[in-house]
Regions:
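Structural microenvironment flanking redox-active thiols in thiol-disulfide oxidoreductases
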Residues: 94-148, 152-158
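Short, small/polar residue-rich loop motifs at catalytic or cofactor-binding pockets
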Residues: 54-56, 168-171
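Hydrophobic beta-strand positions
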Residues: 60-61, 176
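Thiol-/selenol-based redox modules, centered on thioredoxin-like
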Residues: 169-234
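Second-shell loop/turn segments in exported
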Residues: 85-87, 116-120, 144-145, 191-196
Length: 234
């Protein structure tokens, strides 16, 4: 076999090796229904379901700027609910964990962190605002990290009955809320509490936030396509 024939043979084999996975991706991407991993829904008593069966109730608490934040004002965003106080003994460790989330998604307007104060009497608007400004100075968008205070009894009742966090002494529990107000994950200090999760709490939460952000992107894509189809119909 001549050298030219050998080269043609090698080029042909290389082309087949490249073309086969490409055709496989096209076949399964176009002819099959695309699915991606998503998260279950978390309800009272840590019950899990594939369909939404619990939605956090509405709330109305003042943020660090004195503006009222509600559940409905967060619809359309994926957000982390954290419960602690700026006067907590382990505030540095708690903040460090949330800073990882904040920095990872600092340029994503659809991702937010919301702190529910566990000591409303000591968390003044001034201290809350200073805390937020210090930790969000590199954010690409404002209002990505909110600090809520208000009536102490009302706040604690909401944390227990709304966010389903019974132990208010454990500041290291975070809840992941999707764009519709459903709880999709619970994360602890070092242990990843949510069943079927991705591992360690913060890396696991980073991955899970990406999954819920994908849900938003797919929903918007489908809505845009439906709108385009409606406008092109005779």
């Amino acid at each position: 076999m001549s050298t030219r024939s050998k080269w043609k043979k090698y080029i042909g084999l290389a082309g087949m090796l490249f073309l086969f996975p490409l055709l496989w991706l096209v076949f399964f991407g176009v002819l099959s229904k695309h699915k991606f991993k998503t998260l279950s829904y978390l309800g009272p008593e840590n019950t899990l379901a594939e369909d939404p069966h619990y939605r956090i109730p509405d709330f109305a608490f003042a943020d660090e700027n004195g503006n009222i934040l509600t559940r409905d004002s967060l619809l359309g965003k994926v957000w982390v609910a954290a419960c602690y106080s700026t006067s907590d003994e382990h505030i540095a460790q708690i903040t460090e964990r949330l800073l990882n989330i904040n920095f990872k998604y600092r340029n994503e307007p659809d991702i937010a962190i919301v702190v529910f104060s566990t000591r409303c009497e000591s968390d003044t608007p001034e201290s809350a605002k200073a805390y937020i400004e210090q930790n969000t100075q590199y954010n690409g968008f404002s209002n990505k990290w909110k600090y809520l205070t208000g009536n102490q009894d009302a706040m604690q009742a909401y944390i227990r009955n709304g966010l389903l966090i019974q132990d208010l002494s454990n500041e290291a529990i975070f809840k992941l809320i999707d764009a519709d107000g459903h709880i999709r994950g619970e994360y602890g200090n070092t242990e990843y509490h949510f069943l079927g999760g991705a591992g360690d709490s913060i890396p696991g939460m980073v991955q899970d936030i990406a999954l819920l952000k994908k849900e938003i992107d797919i929903r918007r894509y489908n809505e845009r396509k439906a709108k385009e189809a409606a406008t092109t119909q005779p």
